Amino acid sequence: EPSINIANQSFSSNKVDVNLVTPDNWQKIEPKSSMRDSEYIIRNSKGEFNLIVFKNIGGSVDQNINRWINQFSGDQNEKMPLISKEIERNGIKFTFLQNSGSFNGGMGQSEEFDNAALIGFIVQNSQNTYYYKAVAEVDVLHESKENIIDTILKSSI
């Protein structure tokens, strides 16, 4: 069974708001939509992709996770099988989602394509809920998977 090691991260403080401390390969850009809180281009040796951040958008965590899952169809890629996992640290709840297959398009990401993958996080603190979502070709996203997980977990707590 696929697993992801997010439970053993160390957490130091209880921030009320998220301020991403990003690696050098993350470039903050002007969000392409007013619905987006922020947006980053992440580059690696396989290519580049956008990580989109929403803040306090509608729907429950489960509704958003299910919507993201349903944006994919067909066979999953063994590098990025469906994983949905929740952890809580210092009063902050993290919901991690990974999925792959054929991307059917979604809000602000209407281009359909095959061999796609998604990494998503929903981070809930006492005041806000942040939604992090990246969709890209499997090999491109897989190369940055641990980098994304580490950055979001370490910056959110």
Language-model features: locations:
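Sec-dependent signal peptide cleavage junction
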Residues: 1-14
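Solvent-exposed coil/turn segments that connect beta secondary-structure elements
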Residues: 45, 56-58, 100-104, 127, ...
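Surface-exposed amphipathic alpha-helical segments
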Residues: 26, 127-157
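Soluble non-cytosolic domains of exported or imported proteins
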Residues: 17, 58-63, 113, 139-146
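Extracytoplasmic/secreted envelope proteins and their assembly/folding machinery
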Residues: 23, 62-69, 119-120, 145-153
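Second-shell loop/turn segments in exported
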Residues: 50-58, 108, 134-142
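Secretory pathway targeting signatures of secreted, lumenal, and periplasmic proteins
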Residues: 19-75
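Signature of long, low-cysteine stretches enriched in small and polar/charged residues
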Residues: 32, 66-123
